[in-house]
Amino acid sequence: MKKVIIRKTEEIENWKRNINNEINFIPTMGNLHNGHIKLISTAKNDNSNVNLVSIFINPLQFDNKLDLENYPKTIDNDIKISFSNGADAIFIPSNEDIYPPNNKNIKFLKAPIELSSALCGLNRIGHFDGVCTVVYRLLNLIKPKNLYLGEKDWQQLLILKNLVLKEKLNVAIKSIPTQRDFDGIPLSSRNVHLSKNERKLIRFFSSELLEAKKNFQQEKNINLNEIIKKLSAKKISIEYLEHLHPHTLQKARLEDNISLLAGAIRCGETRLIDHVFLMKRRPIIAIDGPAGSGKSTVTKLIAKKLKLLYLDTGAMYRALSWLLLKENIDYKKEKKLLNIFKDISIVFKSNTNSHQDVYVNNCCVTEEIRSQKISSIVSKISSIKEVRKFLVEEQRKIGESGGLVAEGRDIGTTVFPNAELKIFLTASIDERAKRRKSDKQSKDSQEIDLDTLKELIEKRDFEDSNREISPLIKANDAIEIISDGYTINEVVDKIIDLYNDKIPKETEIK
């Protein structure tokens, strides 16, 4: 594809007609650095879409005329960097192109107060209004498939996600982690203004945040006053330093697993921001739903794609049921049940086909626990108070450090009520019966009556939903996905998109 530079808004439509492809859009204000390069190269490697970089210094984002005049302008080098790192086209409009004089159709937007009044919004009055206005204008001109943004400007990222949702814009936001320079400070177009001594101060500020992140993993708490004291001792001018919820930007709560430690300081005439995410444990995805909804297949694929542990809690109940049958133990007798808990070992192991096998007391029972015989009793056994108590404790032990995706019927309500993402995956009884029939026929040649399967599923649903202990219900904060008419991969992609929207990419960096 021929690389092009577009300078007029009216040329955008002509260019779009000629490319016959979806667009990845990377908006910038120029003076490109390695952070921008990471955005462009990520877009290039993500898919086969056309990559469009814009270079526009938006006057509405500046509350200080001198700051606008002093903003670095390196257009020739920016063009070279963009094209050499994967841009197919560059859009370099003028102020008059973006904000035509006397054009009453331009929509000047206000950023949501709940997100824009904290952090940078405290002193940069109108800044985020300007961001919303220009991005809304650009998105409506370009109509990209994907919008690539950096997590360095986390508050801005939250505000733009809100904009896309509120204005019902058909674009997916893809974020990349904060990119840091050789000395640990976040890459910024304003770094060129720093003297050697000022850069030293920024480095100290960033290192204190990173040290706080490291300490938080051990101590699970943060002492803001101690950090402020250290920064003040270095004569660093602190604009703000806050410990907040990463999505609401309200004060962090004790129960928050992921929180945001964000600060802004001034070095001479230059104002710079940095942040880290604090985590008590790695994220957890909880997927609940009725039998035959596709939970196991979906959860396995999500675990593989996100490199998370796959915790099949249903298999644990089935494994225990299998052992009770094998040992001919009457599960209605509490004493015998308690005795078997002392000796049972349920272990998951990856096999040579990249699948997970289930072992009970060193015996592989992967296939046996999926038999109709086990299916007919597992709901009854899983409703026994002592059984649930024992296995929930085992599941929580596995999840103490997080980093897993678990599926079952009470994951989001009982086992991991503080999971970062809760999904309630379901489908119609007809759809679930068809899936079960297909699944069983692929494993054996025995003909299975569809109506019989429907009856069995309805019976299992009733038992699961009406049991006294941990019934199958949708958690209040769970997102329901009805999978009728969707492929497995479409459901998986939907859940991964929801995960990426909730979990900052930076949390994946060790």
Curated annotation (Swiss-Prot):
Cytidylate kinase: annotated span: 277-510
Source taxonomy: Bacteria, Bacillati, Cyanobacteriota, Cyanophyceae, Synechococcales
EC number: 6.3.2.1, 2.7.4.25
UniProt cross-references to NCBIfam families, sorted A to Z: cmk (TIGR00017), panC (TIGR00018), PRK13477.1 (NF010004)
Organism of provenance: Prochlorococcus marinus (strain MIT 9215)
Single GO MF descriptor: ATP binding
Subcellular location: Cytoplasm
Functional note: Catalyzes the condensation of pantoate with beta-alanine in an ATP-dependent reaction via a pantoyl-adenylate intermediate.
UniProt: (R)-pantoate binding residues: 61, 156
Family of the protein in this entry: In the N-terminal section; belongs to the pantothenate synthetase family. In the C-terminal section; belongs to the cytidylate kinase family. Type 1 subfamily.
Active site (catalytic residues): 36 (proton donor)
Record-listed ATP binding positions: 29-36, 150-153, 187-190
Name this polypeptide is given: Bifunctional pantoate ligase/cytidylate kinase
Catalytic activity annotation: (R)-pantoate + beta-alanine + ATP = (R)-pantothenate + AMP + diphosphate + H(+); CMP + ATP = CDP + ADP; dCMP + ATP = dCDP + ADP
Pfam families: Cytidylate_kin, Pantoate_ligase
Major localization class: cytoplasm
GO CC annotations on file: cytosol
Region of interest called Pantoate--beta-alanine ligase, as start-end residue ranges on this chain: 1-276
Keywords on record: ATP-binding, Cytoplasm, Kinase, Ligase, Multifunctional enzyme, Nucleotide-binding, Pantothenate biosynthesis, Transferase
Gene Ontology biological process: nucleobase-containing small molecule interconversion; pantothenate biosynthetic process; pyrimidine nucleotide metabolic process
SUPFAM superfamilies reported in the protein's UniProt record: Nucleotidylyl transferase, P-loop containing nucleoside triphosphate hydrolases
